[in-house]
Amino acid sequence: MARIAGINIPTHKHIVIGLQSIFGIGDTRAKATCKILKLDPATKVVDIAEDQLELIRAEVAKYEVEGDLRRQVSMDIKRLKDLGCYRGVRHRKSLPLRGQRTKTNARTRKGPRRLIK
């Protein structure tokens, strides 16, 4: 199992798919990383040499991923809540932020229905 940015990358998958298991790396960034390092995106992780894995680790280290990114996102949400702006209030009330209707939908965001007795 290859370990990149503190995450075990699945060895049986292609490198592009394996990189996407790291929080903060999506399809575009995974393909860009392969292009920068001149790796074939269809290469399986198990077939990649250790020196190439070191190059991948160095490239991924340039990005903000995993714990740092999660911390930044949570701090951004906390800042919105502290400001008391519309988005912060919606976060605080666990309601949709971007103008979706809430009369009939938004069950995922609101949580299960509360029983009225």
Swiss-Prot record:
One of its GO terms (cellular component) is cytosol. GO terms for biological process: translation. Keywords: Ribonucleoprotein, Ribosomal protein, RNA-binding, rRNA-binding, tRNA-binding. PANTHER family: 30S RIBOSOMAL PROTEIN S13/40S RIBOSOMAL PROTEIN S18, SMALL RIBOSOMAL SUBUNIT PROTEIN US13M. Part of the 30S ribosomal subunit. Forms a loose heterodimer with protein S19. Forms two bridges to the 50S subunit in the 70S ribosome. Located at the top of the head of the 30S subunit, it contacts several helices of the 16S rRNA. In the 70S ribosome it contacts the 23S rRNA (bridge B1a) and protein L5 of the 50S subunit (bridge B1b), connecting the 2 subunits; these bridges are implicated in subunit movement. Contacts the tRNAs in the A and P-sites. Residues 94-117 are annotated as: Disordered. It holds the Pfam family Ribosomal_S13. Gene3D superfamilies: 1.10.8.50, 30s ribosomal protein s13, domain 2. HAMAP family: Ribosomal_uS13. This is Small ribosomal subunit protein uS13. Belongs to the universal ribosomal protein uS13 family. GO terms for molecular function: rRNA binding; structural constituent of ribosome; tRNA binding. InterPro entries: Rbsml_uS13_C (IPR027437), Ribosomal_uS13 (IPR001892), Ribosomal_uS13-like_H2TH (IPR010979), Ribosomal_uS13_bac-type (IPR019980), Ribosomal_uS13_CS (IPR018269).
